[in-house]
């Protein structure tokens, strides 16, 4: 349910459970975390999904069985944030719930026009993963973060772009090409220089 393609310093992870809107199981989260933790030599990392949805969040059956409070979510986002190369979320469709943590942990987020963004954690009776509100607030500010997490608002791709939650809106056929193009300079650069710039950017 997870595919990994590695080519010349670029690691591309694809969530590959389109029949379930790429809903994340514990096994998928564990595999994703292991890949991200192993990506210390990756010069670029792209995360995308198969089908028309990036991810619907956690698998509903597993969420009620304890996945909602699993440490795997935080382990995954921490591992993505620690990747030394440029990390890009290429959002091929809607991004919902706990899957938001993956995108927030990336350096750059690109999305298709039909993507929607929502995080209904409060409605379902759970707290978000600890780093998610902090990363979201750093991008869009506390008030807009509360609009999503507490107000239950669903954003369109254009609203997400205006808020600063994503950096570009692209047609589906251009999404991965643009992600690869953005990563190409970092892949070609000196690793030390790339790491230095990444550190200076915060």
Where in this protein do the model-derived segments appear?
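Conserved CoA-thioester-binding segment of acyl-CoA-metabolizing enzymes
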Residues: 1-50
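Hydrophobic/aromatic residues within transmembrane alpha-helices
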Residues: 13, 47, 59, 102-104, ...
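Glycine- (often His-adjacent) and acidic-residue-rich active-site loop
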Residues: 30, 34, 41, 49-82, ...
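Well-ordered beta-strand positions
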Residues: 44, 93, 108, 147, ...
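Glycine-rich phosphate-binding loop at the start of an alpha helix
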Residues: 74, 97, 127-130, 154
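Glycine-rich beta-to-alpha active-site loop
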Residues: 79-124
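C-terminal long alpha-helix characteristic of the crotonase
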Residues: 110-115, 166-202
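Hydrophobic, secondary-structure "cap" segments at the distal end of domains
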Residues: 134-143
């Amino acid at each position: 349910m997870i595919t990994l393609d590695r080519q010349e310093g670029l690691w591309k992870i694809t969530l590959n459970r389109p029949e379930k809107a790429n809903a994340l199981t514990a096994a998928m989260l564990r595999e994703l975390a292991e890949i991200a933790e192993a990506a210390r030599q990756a010069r670029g990392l792209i995360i995308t999904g198969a089908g028309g949805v990036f991810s619907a969040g956690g698998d509903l059956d597993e969420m009620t069985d304890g996945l909602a409070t699993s440490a795997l979510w935080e382990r995954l986002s921490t591992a993505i944030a620690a990747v030394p190369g440029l990390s890009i979320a290429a959002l091929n469709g809607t991004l919902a719930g706990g899957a938001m943590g993956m995108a927030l942990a990336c350096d750059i987020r690109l999305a298709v026009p039909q993507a929607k963004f929502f995080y209904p954690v409060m409605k379902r009776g759970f707290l978000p993963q600890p780093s998610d509100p902090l990363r979201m607030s750093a991008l869009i500010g506390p008030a807009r973060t509360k609009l999503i997490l507490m107000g239950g608002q669903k954003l369109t791709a254009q609203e997400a772009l205006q808020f600063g939650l994503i950096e570009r809106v692209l047609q589906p056929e251009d999404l991965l090409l643009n992600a690869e193009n953005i990563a190409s300079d970092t892949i070609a650069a000196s690793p030390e220089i790339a790491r230095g710039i990444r550190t200076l950017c915060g």
